[in-house]
Amino acid sequence: MGLFELNLAIILFIIGNFIGLEYSYRKYSSPYVEKGIDKFALAISVFGGILINSPLYMLGCLLIGFPLGMRPGYGRVEFVVGLAVALFLYFLRW
């Protein structure tokens, strides 16, 4: 992995954060909710965790950044699940 690819992955992660923030502001009107898991964000995060361990890791960075960028109170569980999937697959491959 070269420096260009790493920088592109970081930029895509940040773009994923912005997309997640925009999504959460459009979907949720209340500022903070502790209950409930967003199924769409969970699916995006798990799929991103799978793609991080493949040649499409840049797209995985975009997708796993999506739930991390959501409003406070949203996306925490989804991000942790996606990160756990990514780490599990990394150690399984290692």
From Swiss-Prot:
| TM segment ranges | 1-21, 46-66, 72-92
Keyword field: Cell membrane, Membrane, Transmembrane, Transmembrane helix
Q: How does it sit in the membrane?
A: Multi-pass membrane protein
Q: State a GO cellular component annotated for this protein.
A: plasma membrane
Q: Where in the cell is it found?
A: Cell membrane
Please name the InterPro entries in this protein's record.
Answer: EhaL, Prd_NiFe_hyd_3_EhaL
Its main localization is membrane
Protein name, UniProt field: Uncharacterized protein MJ0518
